[in-house]
């Protein structure tokens, strides 16, 4: 099965799930995780109709994104270190993994310098796993007002990865 066939299959599943849930399918964004895949594969995906791509490593994105011009739109989905924020602001249209007040401040600072507004998702560690990044829910609530007041960033929601379970309903 080629990428176009896979994409079509996934889109059909999304449509069916939206119909079951009474949700508008246009409200769902399919983000293809492109990490470790070469630019040629991303170009094939774009030709097949995929628009949004997620990268989790700044160095890989710096090498790949310039080789994928056109309709591709890029989101950062990995753990972001403060010293990589400048590059992230330059390369991406959204950062989906903001996990601290200090990181929020740095993104705001770099966005002000770049005259760019960055949509962000706040990463929440819902499982409470020490090995995972993200806010503890109580900590996020305590800092949210200050983060929301920072210039040049817009909180668009939360990003959370539930703990692994063999029972999908437990992950909801």
Question: Over which residues does each language-model region extend?
Answer:
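Conserved alpha/beta-domain cores
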Residues: 1-172
């Amino acid at each position: 099965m080629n990428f176009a066939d896979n994409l079509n299959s996934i889109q059909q599943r999304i449509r069916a799930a939206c119909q079951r849930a009474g949700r508008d399918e246009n409200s769902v964004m399919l983000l293809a995780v492109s990490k470790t895949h070469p630019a040629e594969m991303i170009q094939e995906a774009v030709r097949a109709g995929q628009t949004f791509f997620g990268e989790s490593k700044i160095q890989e994105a710096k090498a790949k994104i310039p080789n994928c011009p056109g309709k591709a739109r890029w989101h950062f989905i990995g753990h972001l270190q403060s010293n990589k924020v400048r590059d992230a602001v330059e390369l991406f249209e959204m950062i989906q993994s903001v996990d601290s007040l200090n990181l929020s401040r740095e993104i705001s600072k770099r966005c002000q310098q770049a005259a760019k507004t960055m949509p962000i998702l706040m990463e929440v560690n819902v499982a409470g796993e020490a090995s995972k990044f993200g806010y503890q829910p109580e900590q996020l609530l305590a800092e949210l007002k200050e983060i929301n007041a920072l210039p040049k960033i817009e909180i668009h929601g939360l990003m959370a990865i539930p703990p692994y379970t063999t029972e999908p309903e437990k992950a909801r």
